[in-house]
Amino acid sequence: MTLKTIEGTFTAAKGRYALVVGRFNSFVVESLVQGAIDTLVRHGVEQSELTIIRVPGAFEIPLVAQKVAQRGEFDAIIALGAVIRGGTPHFEYVAGECTKGLAQVSLQFGVPVAFGVLTVDSIEQAIERSGTKAGNKGAEAALSALEMVSLMAALEAK
């Protein structure tokens, strides 16, 4: 017996992509943005199909992602930002609400939302995850978005 498998690919994921980007910790976030753009273009997405929307920080990303999803113009949203732990509970609130809000947007509107918001304990970890030792999480989020766009199309075609 053969099990039927439906999955997305990276090659059949043409579409329009919104990158919702938090400006806070921009020294890290800009590397995430570049990684995402490079990955999308390398997989055949035209730069004219990309829109970058900048917000103050990670906490504001879900609201803007919601507005973007509501408009129905984009096949996927890529959320990019960086929340670095400090000495107060602020980190937990921002990271948790950003994560929860983005999941809610995806479920509410049926639009893939790729999570490329770093939630790290130190600046060193942020730097590692934005293009050095631990890869580029912006590029990984872009790959996730590509795959999800393709998967959603496959599911709708069935």
From Swiss-Prot:
Catalyzes the formation of 6,7-dimethyl-8-ribityllumazine by condensation of 5-amino-6-(D-ribitylamino)uracil with 3,4-dihydroxy-2-butanone 4-phosphate. This is the penultimate step in the biosynthesis of riboflavin. Keywords: Riboflavin biosynthesis, Transferase. (2S)-2-hydroxy-3-oxobutyl phosphate binds at residues 87-88, 129. It catalyses: (2S)-2-hydroxy-3-oxobutyl phosphate + 5-amino-6-(D-ribitylamino)uracil = 6,7-dimethyl-8-(1-D-ribityl)lumazine + phosphate + 2 H2O + H(+). Forms an icosahedral capsid composed of 60 subunits, arranged as a dodecamer of pentamers. The keyword Transferase applies. It comes from the Bacteria. One of its GO terms (cellular component) is cytosol. It is an enzyme of class 2 (transferase). One of its GO terms (biological process) is riboflavin biosynthetic process. 5-amino-6-(D-ribitylamino)uracil binds at residues 24, 58-60, 82-84, 115. This is 6,7-dimethyl-8-ribityllumazine synthase. GO terms for molecular function: 6,7-dimethyl-8-ribityllumazine synthase activity. Its EC number is 2.5.1.78. The active site is at 90 (proton donor). Pathway: Cofactor biosynthesis; riboflavin biosynthesis; riboflavin from 2-hydroxy-3-oxobutyl phosphate and 5-amino-6-(D-ribitylamino)uracil: step 1/2. Gene3D superfamilies: Lumazine/riboflavin synthase (3.40.50.960). Belongs to the DMRL synthase family.
